[in-house]
């Protein structure tokens, strides 16, 4: 009857074709314990979807978008070089019952933000018109919400770069470029279910300024949270690089806040009318590991990577770094117009 059943899903985390994780979400008070009983059933229950991952692609300018779960993009397959945008919403999107995001797979590798006004999942045709063509139809208000964030040449909310004492290296390129600095970009939806959706990105032979790196990224979203978890891992580091995680500041008038939350996290937070045309209140934050945090810097106002705060984190080869990106929009919850409410 659903009253005593915790929504769950089984996941294949090592991609061997067999499930190895039973995943569910539960609320706990501090030091609270709960008894959960595992019962095998013949038929898997169908639960309300509280997370989703979506990706669509058209194979030519004249063919309709079709759903897909994976993609390989080569350096010469940017919109500027092939003459059209091949990806629905410029790349994959993921959401939960609170908020949504999208990743610009088209070489830019920035993270954009969908504000949501409903707990239901957004329609499958977001970013596609009636003819099946890629179309920017999400910068206007719908019943479910809309794209609310101006990204420009930043990396959006939770995108990242590498930084040294002398240079800032963007993973990928801008909308004006026709050749990527990443030789091969691979993407796949690892899992999509009612309580967890996960995406994987790999970047092979990223070559900024005479260097060569490979990068692996896992993006995870679960219900009930106004954000997502990101795990990134680098190979090819020379030793002078730090990770730089972005918090876009194109429409900011109010200063960034740095909160020393506890022994695990540092929070970089902004709260402002920082949506498109500065129409609504929006709080955004990065939660980064305290033992890796090296302070923050601000990107230039022009160039390949601009208009963003950057949290600097210590890096080592093949060591995963985990951080969280969070946002609260006043039309999702009117209380997000209050900076103290968002902060707390």
Residue ranges and their predicted role:
Residues 11-29, 285-344:
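Beta-strand-rich recognition/accessory modules
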Residues 215, 221, 226-260:
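Acidic (Asp/Glu-rich), glycine- and aromatic
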Residues 34-44, 199-203, 319-331:
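Short, hydrophobic/aromatic-enriched beta-strand segments in well-ordered soluble domains
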Residues 1-67, 71-73, 77, 82, ...:
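Alpha-mannosidase-like glycoside hydrolase catalytic domains involved in N-glycan trimming
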Residues 142-222:
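Extended, loop-rich substrate-binding clefts of extracytoplasmic carbohydrate-active enzymes
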Residues 3, 43-45, 94-95, 99-103, ...:
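Primarily extracytoplasmic ectodomains and periplasmic/lumenal surface modules that are beta-strand-rich
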Residues 84, 90-178, 227:
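Extended polysaccharide-engagement surfaces of secreted carbohydrate-active enzymes
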Residues 1-21, 207, 251-267, 290-302:
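Solvent-exposed beta-strand/loop surfaces of large extracellular or lumenal domains
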